[in-house]
Amino acid sequence: DISRYQHEPSSQTVRRGRRRRKVTYPILWNQLRITSLGSMSKKRVEGNVDYPISFIYIKSTEGKSLTNRYFRADYAAARKHGYRVGAYHFFSTRTTARQQADNFIKNSRYQKGDLPPALDVEPSAAQISQMGGIRVLLKSVRSWLEDVGHRLGVQPILYVSQSFVNKYLTDDNPDGDYLRKNYQVWIARYGEYKPDVHLAIWQLSPDGRVRGIRGLVDINVFNGFEEAFRDFSSISAHSLPQPSPR
């Protein structure tokens, strides 16, 4: 997955006239190949790493108003070069689910055949506390997923860490239990992994390398064979169970 950090991998600046601007780098779309799984992946690979890329998630929005200035160009270029592409939203604990859903839908380009929208949830313990606790957070996460799913007609997926699953997507948190049972998960888990959720995508490394991209790149693997991958975007929002009373 990519965001503005693949275009701006450091704080390096260059002077242009009277101003200094960040050094930016293009993505060389016709050269993309995975060349390293990174230091945090425990996968053992014989020989050189040189893998093709079949799908790309691009950060679109964050919170109620932040956007990725590179999203539209990267989205169009990825599709032009034949990659399956999806957009993701970085969840904020400082604003409502509805405002964040509005921001995502307004600024993302979901088209038929794209990968399902994804919600990236990575709050710290302090942020959860400031929001009002885990039950408030989970209710807001669920609201975003249901709202976006209803408005786009496709069921989003949930990006979380293994520790988030273990702590919060449990049967003693009603909304957490609902999310675990009814949504596919894109999980960040570094090392060997036996899925204990409805796994869609496994992020096996946050520090991989891809030819054609400057800086580090998250490396992700789809959980399934080619036929399942082709069907991945056809997960209808309307196939979800009716929301339980809250």
Question: Residue ranges of each PLM-predicted region?
Answer:
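Catalytic domains of cell-wall/extracellular-matrix polysaccharide-remodeling enzymes
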Residues: 116-196
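Flexible, glycine-rich phosphate/dinucleotide-binding loops
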Residues: 65, 94, 165, 194, ...
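Substrate-binding cleft of extracellular glycoside hydrolase catalytic domains
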Residues: 1-151
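Low-complexity, flexible helical/coil segments
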Residues: 90-96, 120-128, 154-155, 219-228, ...
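Functionally critical loop-and-helix segments that line ligand-binding/catalytic clefts
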Residues: 1-46, 174-246
